Amino acid sequence: MVRVKNVKMYKKRSLQLIRLAIELAKNNNIELARMYIKLALLYSRKLKFKIPIEYKRLFCRKCFTPLIIGITERRRIKNKVLVRTCLYCGWTRRYKLQYKTTNKKSKS
């Protein structure tokens, strides 16, 4: 029972650290933001819980820099692929863009 409480507490703290790291990066304190993200990942590895994907996509996997468009990240769309590039280490990640198609034919 104690371990379950600890995991919930540390998961909440990890997500809070990632959000705080984003705010620090916006205020040009990149090194402290990196340390916060490393600490959040350390918690998740140590206590074996997963960080949600929307938080995982907020930082570079190679140098742990929070990714902020125009400051630490460059985004380009090429051939229906979103390319995200970290401006500190050059790490790139590609996401396939899926457009929703609408059927304009109405049944008469």
UniProtKB/Swiss-Prot annotation:
Keywords: Cytoplasm, Endonuclease, Hydrolase, Metal-binding, Nuclease, tRNA processing, Zinc. This is Ribonuclease P protein component 4. Part of ribonuclease P, a protein complex that generates mature tRNA molecules by cleaving their 5'-ends. Its main location: cytoplasm. Its cofactor is Zn(2+). It is an enzyme of class 3 (hydrolase). Binds 1 zinc ion per subunit. Zn(2+) binds at residues 60, 63, 86, 89. Consists of a catalytic RNA component and at least 4-5 protein subunits. The keyword Hydrolase applies. The gene is rnp4. The lineage of its organism: Archaea, Thermoproteota, Thermoprotei, Sulfolobales, Sulfolobaceae. It catalyses: Endonucleolytic cleavage of RNA, removing 5'-extranucleotides from tRNA precursor. GO terms for biological process: tRNA 5'-leader removal. Pfam families: Rpr2. One of its GO terms (molecular function) is ribonuclease P activity. One of its GO terms (cellular component) is cytoplasm. It is found in: Cytoplasm. Belongs to the eukaryotic/archaeal RNase P protein component 4 family. Its EC number is 3.1.26.5.
